[in-house]
Amino acid sequence: MGIINGKEFIDRLNKLENEIWYDGEKIKGNISEHPAFKGIIKTKSSLYELQTKDELIHEMTYCLPGDHNRIGLSYLQPKTKNDLKKRRTMIEHWARHTHGMMGRSPDYMNTVMMSFASSAELLKDKENCFPEHILDMYEQAAKHDLSFTHTFITPQVNRSQSYFGLSEKPISAKVIDRTEKGLMIHGARLLATQGGLTDEILVFSAPKFFFETDEAYAFSIPSNTKGVKFITRESFVLSDSSFNHPLSSRYEEMDSIVVFDHVLVPWNRVFFYDNVEAAKDFMTKSSFHAFTFHQVVIRQMIKIEFLLGVAQLLVDTINVSEYQHIQEKLSEIIVGLETIKALIDKSENDAQLDEFGYMRPCLIPLQVISTIIPKLYPRFTEIIQLIGASGMVTLPTENAFDSEIREDLDQYLQATNTNAEERVKIFRLAWDLTMSSFGTRQTHYERYFFGDPIRISSRLYTSYPKQEQLNMIKTFLHADTEH
């Protein structure tokens, strides 16, 4: 079958009839028409449409040997550095189309599945592990251009390291039975971004201090599997107006709690279960981090380009480019952007073949980006707020410009080089990016995208090779003092 277009994505999603609860009510009818979801579904469909365009199809898709059906390039298992460059080009195309605002664009989860398949052999001959199921799922996903969400975070009942989930009824999703047909899962998982808006949901074990056997599993099931419900938060879509809410009306992804109510996971969908070692080691020893970090930081690079553009447009609109403190603030963004670009280049240039014959980008530069992004992104949004100042809160709506007060607005909200309506449109973009409920969620999302920033820093420290530097200092200290 191969790649799908935008209409096929929407039609398939509507037919699933996933159980989604919004504001205490179960959604009925086509999910693509619901006010809280139609914006992101339309945007997502445009991504699928993008890969079918004649001018992009060879940069967004590829064919397997002997097969004329085109497959999304996000499923490509890279075997050369040139393959990594191809993947980067594809990721950049999709990220630029959404200005980096869609954290769960299809290529993210496609990359996750690709990384699992590329390292499936790690599970070979391990107890209760089925690497062949991962490979089959990967093949089906690529063949049918399936969309995925994932969930692995447990409910925040008690976050102390010594906490055990000993409640009578499961809170965190657990295996409560093993039957001839498959695993029985009951409980909840937190944070499935775009939960209910995809074909499949990938579920795996969260990193934790103590692992219980009944929580050591990984599987993928259709989002409309009986007993799976997605309970969403309040939508940040405040209107359909691209003037009033230029970003949230397009890119509000929605986040969900996933409830598993005695859900049967067929054996052919189980990747592993009742194996604490696999739950602890597969994510860290596989190519998961290398390939997913590569996708994520490219998207974040594009997003920071967008922030730089918005910041410069504000500067031009209110004519403050001559001030050195403004130049310094914009330079902060430029330095961050160029640093990230250079680190991505280094990760690709230093890529090496792994034990399974796949070209992994060097992880250290990607870890450096993941360590600085939680600091850089909030700072860059703050810079936009500081530049905009009071202009970020004195923002009339689109309707105000179609009312009898239009003359007042034109007079008092004009800018040096543009009219009042255009000025407000620019400032509303900056506000939606940094100060609206959508914008603050974006900041929070990037701050915690890879997990706790402290743990990310700790992981970088423990994995960074420091012996060469230590040897250099020891050699210096023991050098002959006469020389």
From Swiss-Prot:
**A Pfam entry, by short name:** HpaB_N
Per the entry, what this protein does is:
Catalyzes the hydroxylation of 4-hydroxyphenylacetic acid (4HPA), leading to the production of 3,4-dihydroxyphenylacetic acid (DHPA).
SUPFAM superfamilies per record: Acyl-CoA dehydrogenase C-terminal domain-like, Acyl-CoA dehydrogenase NM domain-like
Family (UniProt): Belongs to the FADH(2)-utilizing monooxygenase family.
Q: Which InterPro entries match?
A: Acyl-CoA_Oxase/DH_mid-dom_sf, AcylCo_DH-like_C, AcylCoA_DH/oxidase_NM_dom_sf, HpaB/PvcC/4-BUDH, HpaB/PvcC/4-BUDH_C, HpaB/PvcC/4-BUDH_N, HpaB_Deino-type
Signal peptide boundaries: none
Q: Which Gene3D superfamilies does this one have?
A: 4-hydroxybutyryl-coa dehydratase, domain 1, Butyryl-CoA Dehydrogenase, subunit A, domain 2, Butyryl-CoA Dehydrogenase, subunit A, domain 3
The gene is yoaI
Any one GO MF term held by the record is: oxidoreductase activity, acting on the CH-CH group of donors
Indicate what this protein is called per its UniProt record.
Probable 4-hydroxyphenylacetate 3-monooxygenase
Pathway(s) the chain acts in: Aromatic compound metabolism; 4-hydroxyphenylacetate degradation; pyruvate and succinate semialdehyde from 4-hydroxyphenylacetate: step 1/7
Q: Per the UniProt entry, what is one GO biological process?
A: phenylacetate catabolic process
Q: What highest taxon heads this organism's lineage?
A: Bacteria
Binding-site residues for FAD, renumbered to this chain = 150-152, 156-159, 193, 452-455
